[in-house]
Amino acid sequence: MNIKNILSERVSAAMVAAGLPEGTNPAISLSNRPQFGDYQANGVMGAAKKLKTNPRELATKVVAELDLDGIASKIELAGPGFINIHLDESWLAAQLNEVAQDDFIGVAQRGTTPGDESQTVVVDYSAPNLAKEMHVGHLRSTIIGDAVVRALEFRGDKVIRQNHMGDWGTQFGMLIAHLSDKLASDEVAETALADLENFYREAKVRFDNEEGFADRARADVVKLQSGDEACAKLWQQFIDISITHSEEIYAKLNVSLKRSDIMGESAYNDDLSTVVDELMAKKIAEESQGAKVVFINEMANKDGEAPVFIVQKSGGGFLYATTDLSACRYRSGKLAANRIIIFTDARQALHFKQVEIVARKAGLLPENVGYQHCPFGMMMGDDGKPFKTRTGGTIKLAELLDESIVRAAALIKEKNPDITDTDLTEISKKVGIGAVKFADLSKNRTSDYIFDWKTMLSFEGATAPYLQYAYSRIQSIFSKAGTVKNDAVINIIEPQEKALALKLLQLEDVVDAVISECTPNLLCNYLYELASLYMSFYEACPILKEGISGEVKASRLALCNVVADTLKQGLDILGIETMERM
């Protein structure tokens, strides 16, 4: 159910009938104020300018041809040529009654409408470096990517998750050398690697300061890359323990990534020399000071100086660039992706722009495959600097999430002193984790944001606790009513009911925008607006009050049910859990 699409088709047909060229954009948008209608068609203004004609006269012709019988109760001209559309309450109620019976709450599934076929979408997100614990810097890629993945799947696309973990590189040489020494002193690997962050720090200190250790580390890198069994065995221990740690974080975050989604950097090793050979054979890459590089002329500055994109170092080693080119080939070829989406912080935007240019030129990424790098801003402390511990250290993601649960538990206990320990444990986890996720997801993806415990854990405003409370409040009404009639007919009588119906029927449009722009904040905004409209409806339209007719009560309970389903589904797309009571 997409009102915007329905109106676009009708207004477009009227524009053609009024003599405008086919394909003229009707520019349908939601009205900001109810007195100007529910939707507006503003396309006549732009069309009149191109045709050098009077916009109001043109709009009058369009309105004369516009067939919205049974859909709109009133169509009116406003200003120089805007068309205001007031939707009929009976039509809205009919649409909402269909939505109430639909498993997908009115969101059409791919393949059910001509021209809206399911796509294969590869999504690269989270991608922590192994041999280190996940820190707060990994939060955004992990949860933004997961929200977009869930939105794609809800719409009916085939999604292939790719967790491009950093499981390769020169740092593993020093880690293997340090672990080898630990094991030689009879320490078991699990004990030595219990604190990955501390282990990494110890190895780095030895690499920087201990005579002979750096040489051993470099030698171990060569051995690892040459397939040495002993080094490979130690490397695998790092990988296994690191992945287990990441899986614990994903479970706590309610993120859908699984071990089977991992496609680490090492998975592309066998293809890297082939990629470079192809680039050289096609004269795309060339030798420069012993290295093999691509001069990206498409990005040359005003002096004609092109950026240098290194694909193989002078010593023979490969880089992230080479791995990312190989990934383009694998994802567009082996995985048959129609679209590739990558979530990393904004500092890598230039790198991925260069990767796309080189990959397309080399034929590693066909022109008909979409390639979308989605950069995001940073999480900042209240001092406006990157979020750190008080001593300036990196905050472990596990510790941040644990703190969110503790803080949520204190707030819930304060509001409900009689809550059982079992309920407190379950609810505080959902509220605490949900608060952290919503605070992040509700911000514009490309913007930095200030991390603030007080705001995110508030039960007022655009927060997860507010939305979770709205959902549980509806469940409380159902409990008091003793029944929920899903098949009851919804009637729209009061303005608050109409406002709620209009918002509910916008879900597909919002989900499509999230999918297109990879911006979960649009869904966060929608859910907050929906919950706010529900609260207004609840205050103005009694449901269980004595004297309310059975028909009105059933209608309003059915309306509540659609709101509850929409809140639950929307929060599920964001990876945030709901509860029946708080």
UniProtKB/Swiss-Prot annotation:
Pfam family, any one: tRNA-synt_1d
Reactions catalysed: tRNA(Arg) + L-arginine + ATP = L-arginyl-tRNA(Arg) + AMP + diphosphate
InterPro entries xrefs: aa-tRNA-synth_I_CS, Arg-tRNA-ligase, Arg-tRNA-synth_N, Arg-tRNA-synth_N_sf, ArgRS_core, DALR_anticod-bd, Rossmann-like_a/b/a_fold, tRNAsynth_Ia_anticodon-bd
Transmembrane segments: none
Domain of life: Bacteria
Gene Ontology molecular function: arginine-tRNA ligase activity; ATP binding
Cell compartments where the protein resides: Cytoplasm
Main location: cytoplasm
UniProt EC number: 6.1.1.19
Gene Ontology CC annotations of this record: cytoplasm
Keyword line: Aminoacyl-tRNA synthetase, ATP-binding, Cytoplasm, Ligase, Nucleotide-binding, Protein biosynthesis
Top EC class, one word: ligase
Quaternary structure, from the entry: Monomer.
Family: Belongs to the class-I aminoacyl-tRNA synthetase family.
Entry protein name: Arginine--tRNA ligase
Native source organism of the sequence: Colwellia psychrerythraea (strain 34H / ATCC BAA-681)
